[in-house]
């Protein structure tokens, strides 16, 4: 590394590690992954591994190689930059059921947001995901009531001024977008990277105390998919590949570079910041960034 680049990297690291000021009020504890769609196909490497075409259609973000045969090894083998996420060392795979208007898949061309937040009260205790952790969030077989009352539910489907729709609204103002946000469980059992139902190794924090249960003691980042679809007007023919709006769910297969993910979790979640994909909080610029201008750890 050239001396000038080395000094710049060192300066970024020093700024990144600066402690919070005493009056630094904490309002958020998060960072985000900004990723565009890679492709859509009827594969699900978690639920139907090595069975191409066995699933309903999914829309994929992140790692460009994801298919039915995907493993941790294949995600990592894709190599740095084989992702549509801004951080080139995030080789994770993210996917959800494809949205259709009639028989036409609705695929956005803009960046979608996956938030990494604290789901527990003591945000300083959140730990990075172990590499290879994978899970399914939500339930495609849920009833409308179950979807509405699920621990991951926030505001249902939204478009324009219409919120808290637990199925697709019948009409969205022309030019608006259909949006959905849904939160993942953020307590890990500390042992299993997957489970038979792809859910039991994860749990939601207690709703009152916001602490992890004893059988899932490890607090990890709470994912929150915030997905926007370019569809509006008459919504009567809008559906998910999995069914009605309340069948919404998504999958995550972690393949972050461990050091990069740890830097973002430590700086942004544990540090009580509202960070972008670079680990920079524009409201507290004195705290620096977790990653360099290229969205990588300095020196990588």
Which residue stretches match the model-derived regions?
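Bacterial N-terminal signal peptides that target proteins for export
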Residues: 1-7
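Bacterial N-terminal signal peptides
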Residues: 8-16
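Sec/Tat signal peptide C-region and signal peptidase I cleavage site
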Residues: 18-22
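Primary mode marks residue(s) on the alpha4-beta5-alpha5 output face of response regulator receiver
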Residues: 23-55, 59-182, 189-300
């Amino acid at each position: 590394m050239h001396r000038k680049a080395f000094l710049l990297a060192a300066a970024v690291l020093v700024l990144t590690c600066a402690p919070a000021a005493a009056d630094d009020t904490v309002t958020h504890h998060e960072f985000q992954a900004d990723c565009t769609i890679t492709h859509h196909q009827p594969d699900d490497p978690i639920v139907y591994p090595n069975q191409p075409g066995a699933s309903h259609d999914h829309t994929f973000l992140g790692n460009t190689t994801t298919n039915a045969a995907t493993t941790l090894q294949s995600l990592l083998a894709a190599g740095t930059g084989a992702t549509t996420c801004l951080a080139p060392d995030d080789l994770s795979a993210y996917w959800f059921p494809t949205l259709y208007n009639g028989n036409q898949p609705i695929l956005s061309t803009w960046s979608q947001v996956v938030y990494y937040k604290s789901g527990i009260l003591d945000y300083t205790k959140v730990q990075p995901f172990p590499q290879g952790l994978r899970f399914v969030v939500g339930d495609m077989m849920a009833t409308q009531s179950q979807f509405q009352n699920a621990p991951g539910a926030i505001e249902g489907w939204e478009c324009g001024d219409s919120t808290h729709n637990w199925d697709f609204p019948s009409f969205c103002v022309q030019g608006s977008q259909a949006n959905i946000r849904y939160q993942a469980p953020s307590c890990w059992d500390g042992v299993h990277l997957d489970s038979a139902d792809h859910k039991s190794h994860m749990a939601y924090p207690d709703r009152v105390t916001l602490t992890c249960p004893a059988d899932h003691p490890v607090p990890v980042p709470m994912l929150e998919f915030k997905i926007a679809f370019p569809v509006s007007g008459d919504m009567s023919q809008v559906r998910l590949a999995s069914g009605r709006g309340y069948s919404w769910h998504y999958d995550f297969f972690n393949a972050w570079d461990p050091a990069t993910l740890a830097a973002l979790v430590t700086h942004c979640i544990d540090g009580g910041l509202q960070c972008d994909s670079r680990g920079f909080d524009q409201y507290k610029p004195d705290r620096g960034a977790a990653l360099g201008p290229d969205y990588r750890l300095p020196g990588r």
